[in-house]
Amino acid sequence: MAIRNLKPTSPGCRFQTISDFKEITCSSPEKSLTYGLCKKAGRNNHGHITSRRRGGGAKRLYRLIDFKRDKVGVPAKVAQIEYDPNRTARIALLHYVDGEKRYILAPVGIKQGDIIETGVDADIKPGNSLPMLHIPIGTLIHNIELNPGRGGQLCRSAGAYAQLVAREGKYALLRMPSGEVRKVLASGAATVGQVGNIHHENISLGKAGRNRWLGRRPKVRGVAMNPVDHPLGGGEGRSSGGRHPVSPWGMPTKGYKTRDKKKPSSRLIVKRRGQK
């Protein structure tokens, strides 16, 4: 993937950059692996907003992604690399030798015609999935299971990867993208390689409308609201808010620690992010 600059034919195009999509090999998804996606607009089942600044955006079909990679011992061929509007990564359509089709996250270096395998006997090459017990120390991995058999939950966005740095008993030690070093069960599966579309972080949207296409609505500052809506709201004319920055519910922001000190997973974190 490379990034393409647009000609400055309008203010919105002047600083806008887009992907050249050269890695994409088809224009329509596999129909049997898609279904319609209903707009949630940040609401829960009661209709209350639980995720602010969501709504609108282009229509999407959801692609069913195989995060579990449980088809052990059956090789598959990469039929095509596709765009997925529901995630930053690209996806790869696999045709298994028994006739089944599945989508997986497309890692760096994968291409049409490659053979992908799952299981303890799989080679250490991008796209192959196997338990971390059988992955060499130092390997870059993604789509990592926290609970064996539940499916990959870590390192799934564009360019993401963790590094397997050690094994201690039943645990594997991973260096996460944040710099945190944590333990996960080594019997859990992971996929070899780094998630593709690595230049996604360098894309400039260029204009507000492009955010709206993605279903993102404007973010209103607390000091611009009324006192009923935010602790920093109100005042005659422009004001500083009169207190340290807080969320709409009064929780301090700007570095305030919100993690529960008694959280069970804390014992699995060997080194916090940001620590030297």
UniProtKB/Swiss-Prot annotation:
Per the record, where are the segments of Basic residues compositional bias? 259-276
Which top-rank group of organisms is this from? Bacteria
PROSITE patterns assigned to the protein according to its UniProt record, in alphabetical order: RIBOSOMAL_L2 (PS00467)
> What Gene Ontology terms for biological process does this UniProt record contain?
cytoplasmic translation
Q: Which UniProt keywords apply?
A: Ribonucleoprotein, Ribosomal protein, RNA-binding, rRNA-binding
Q: Which InterPro entries match?
A: NA-bd_OB-fold, Rib_uL2_dom2, Ribosomal_uL2, Ribosomal_uL2_bac/org-type, Ribosomal_uL2_C, Ribosomal_uL2_CS, Ribosomal_uL2_dom3, Ribosomal_uL2_RNA-bd_dom
- GO CC terms: large ribosomal subunit
Gene3D superfamilies xref list: 2.30.30.30, Nucleic acid-binding proteins, Ribosomal protein L2, domain 3
GO MF term set = rRNA binding; structural constituent of ribosome; transferase activity
Q: Which residues form a coiled coil?
A: none
Q: Which Pfam families does this UniProt record tie to the protein?
A: Ribosomal_L2, Ribosomal_L2_C
| Location of region: Disordered | 223-276
Q: How does it assemble?
A: Part of the 50S ribosomal subunit. Forms a bridge to the 30S subunit in the 70S ribosome.
Q: What family classification does the UniProt entry report for this protein?
A: Belongs to the universal ribosomal protein uL2 family.
Its function, per the record, reads: One of the primary rRNA binding proteins. Required for association of the 30S and 50S subunits to form the 70S ribosome, for tRNA binding and peptide bond formation. It has been suggested to have peptidyltransferase activity; this is somewhat controversial. Makes several contacts with the 16S rRNA in the 70S ribosome.
Q: What is this protein called?
A: Large ribosomal subunit protein uL2
